[in-house]
């Protein structure tokens, strides 16, 4: 199963707790300050070239797998707790697959998690991502923004980041806007409608068992 991206999802940037954050229009839970609306930019107006692709494996591997996932998606957490381990051991670590992880933002909590994961740079990104998915029920659980941020900071500190680093990353308004625009570009280009979704050598796949995933990879390796 995969989590569907709501059709009403729109990248709105708002001031909350001193930072600029992503929210959605669903249910109208959040009022958007006028200043934030004035500052909003469309994806076409934001230069996304500064966003680093998070990659594992051999850059010259015969197969490229791009995963689209949301940190608040239970199905994504399940994939990373199970099938991803097999994918990494059998295909990524053996040089058969170049794995690219791209974030999808259903809500502001997912954006905050992304900013914490990226705060550690390429070297720490996948380790922090693992911690975020493992602790998903804990940090998402309350649904209260202050508690969510507090739990994400705990994860960042567990990964070796200090409070100054975390504060700087979480308060980076330009980075938040750029990440949202980058996500929109990716989702539009690859026609992403839910998570987790996988683009395997340019072909979209979703709702797969590990056996199906493995069969696709082995077939492509046989053709390589």
Where do the language-model regions lie?
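C-terminal cap of thioredoxin/glutaredoxin-like
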Residues: 2-37, 70, 84, 154-224
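Residues at or immediately flanking beta-strands
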Residues: 6, 64, 96-98, 197
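Short extracytoplasmic/periplasmic juxtamembrane "stem" segments immediately C-terminal to an N-terminal membrane anchor
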Residues: 33-51
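A short beta-strand-turn-helix
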Residues: 45-63
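Conserved strand-loop elements at the edges of beta-sheets that form or border functional pockets
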Residues: 58, 67, 81, 207
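Extracellular/periplasmic catalytic domains that process cell-envelope and extracellular macromolecules
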Residues: 59, 92-94, 124, 190-193
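Immediate post-signal-peptide N-terminus of mature secreted/exported proteins
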Residues: 62, 66-70
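Structural alpha/beta surface segment adjacent to cysteine/selenocysteine redox centers
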Residues: 69-72, 77-157
């Amino acid at each position: 199963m995969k989590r569907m991206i709501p059709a009403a999802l729109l990248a709105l940037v708002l001031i909350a707790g001193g930072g600029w954050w992503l929210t959605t229009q669903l249910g109208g839970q959040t009022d958007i300050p006028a200043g934030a609306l004035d500052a909003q930019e469309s994806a076409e107006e934001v230069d996304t070239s500064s966003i680093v692709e998070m990659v594992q494996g051999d850059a010259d591997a015969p197969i490229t797998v791009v995963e689209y996932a949301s940190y608040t998606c239970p199905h994504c957490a399940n994939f990373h707790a199970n099938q991803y381990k097999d994918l990494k051991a059998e295909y990524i670590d053996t040089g058969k697959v170049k794995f690219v992880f791209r974030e999808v933002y259903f809500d502001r909590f997912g954006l905050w998690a992304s900013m914490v994961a990226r705060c550690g740079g390429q070297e720490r990104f996948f380790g922090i991502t693992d911690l975020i998915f493992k602790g998903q029920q804990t940090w998402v659980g309350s649904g209260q923004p202050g508690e969510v941020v507090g739990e994400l900071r705990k994860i960042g500190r567990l990964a070796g980041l200090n409070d100054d680093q975390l504060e700087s990353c979480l308060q980076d308004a330009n980075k938040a806007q750029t990440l949202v625009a980058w996500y929109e570009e990716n989702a539009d280009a690859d026609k992403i409608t839910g998570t987790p979704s996988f683009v395997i050598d340019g072909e979209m796949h979703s709702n797969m068992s590990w056996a199906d995933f493995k069969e696709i990879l082995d077939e492509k390796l046989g053709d390589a």
